[in-house]
Amino acid sequence: MFKKEFKFNLKSLIIWTTITLAIFLLVYLMYPTIMSSENAKMIDELVKIFPKEVLVAFNMDIASMDSAYGWLKSEGFVFVLLITGCYSGIMGSNILLKEENDKTIEYLHNLPIKRTTIVLNKVLVGLINITTLILVLGIFNYIGLTISGDFDQKQFILLSITPLLSSLVTFFICLFISTFTHKTKKTLGISLGIVLVSYILNTFSAMAKEVEFLKYASVFTLADIRNVILNSSINPIMIIISVVLSLIFLLLTIINYNKKELV
């Protein structure tokens, strides 16, 4: 079952990875030209116009845009969070519903294995695919930065790991939600909504202390990119919260899936 599930999801993994790598490739090819001395001055002047709250929200107050690595720290890794978050949400909302959606549920009924095993096999495929996407992006960006100029390697490695913390929780939340329906159309919108709302809440929470509490409702808070940029370390509390939330939603998924009427 694991091999069948892995092969089925391999195509989407390749498509998502290829498109994302193509975007980053364009950045590395075009950035040296865009950031000529004159353009760099213009961008610096433009940045000064932005309110401080906006600069903080996009880490532009602690990361200069005059290099590809600076762009990665301010906007690039936000893009990675969104891409990996959307991919994780879509996979979480689809992977348990594939047979029901395709009207091939008899395949699962005929398997001599428990439903818990079915869930764990599908979860394993999801974890491998999400990790692979993040790993490939990290390796590609490492090569791109090595060619384009100097960068803090330790900081970069930690930044490349942080999307896992938010992506895994997103995956398990959407996986749990999928146990309440039989159609992927219903869960797809919800999963993307969770990602986009989380991003908006996380962005707004960084703009003012009055709304800082919003970050506690966002999965992207777990990635904590700003802390990594400032301290070159990942807050262990975020790792613990990510693992605990993932395990809780996995347990809830198993319980609910075992009770679900498969049609």
Q: Where do the PLM segments sit?
A:
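Secretory targeting signals
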Residues: 120-179, 233
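Aromatic- and glycine-rich beta-strand/loop motifs that create alpha-glucan
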Residues: 1-21
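Transmembrane helix boundary and interhelical loop/hinge segments in multi-pass membrane proteins
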Residues: 89-109
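A structural motif at transmembrane helix-loop-helix junctions in multipass membrane proteins
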Residues: 164-196, 204
